[in-house]
Amino acid sequence: MSNRKTTIGDNIRKYRKKFGISQDILSKRANLAFHTIAKIEAGSTQDPRIETVKKIADTLGVTLDDLIK
């Protein structure tokens, strides 16, 4: 599980930086709390809800698969 959480967080960070978006901007655009994005990227949150990851994917303009693989 820890590897999956890290992978999701790493992928979110990769795409966020690729598109030049800060955690703060991503959280506002996805209508999520800043700490939610920060914790997922750090891998320190319990398994992130699929709905949350989907919101992030949609906001970044990538697929859910892009973030979980």
Provide a role label for each language-model segment.
Residues 1-7:
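A detector for short, charged/polar N-terminal pre-domain segments
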Residues 6, 17-18, 47:
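Short amphipathic helical patch at the helix-1/turn junction of helix-turn-helix
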Residues 51-66:
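DNA major-groove recognition helix of helix-turn-helix/homeodomain DNA-binding modules
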Residues 32-47:
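Recognition helix of helix-turn-helix/homeodomain-like DNA-binding domains
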Residues 12, 26, 37-40, 67:
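Conserved hydrophobic/aromatic packing and binding residues within compact polymer-binding modules
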Residues 10-29:
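Short basic helix-loop element that most often maps to the first helix and adjoining turn
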